[in-house]
Amino acid sequence: MGQLMKEYRQQQKKRRADKNRKKVYVASRYAGDVKTNTQAAIHYCRFVIKKGLMPIASHLLYPQILDDNKPADRELGLAFGLALLGLCDEVWVFGPVSRGMAAEIEEAKRLNKPLRCFKEVGV
């Protein structure tokens, strides 16, 4: 029974550590070459994970639910993304800045979020 409790405590400790990881909002291009940009965003999220942090990439989530070709849906997705950005500890920007990314950068500055900019990382 002692070993079982030890394993349980270790699992609980790991869950708490995972839950308390810093959250990083990943800002990168989506529109245009969607397939290439999606693959790049996935790569950037993996980069964040390798740094021991939790990536939040709204542009990998909301296009699955909303139609990015409909202006109202696109605006809603951007608004949801900015709301998620507010929950994050930092904002990391990857590659050239698009119009949507510029709005994310402005929101990060408004909220005094630490902002890190990267060239395209190993895509």
Annotate each PLM feature.
Residues 1-123:
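Catalytic phosphate/metal-binding cores of nucleic-acid and nucleotide-processing enzymes, i.e., regions
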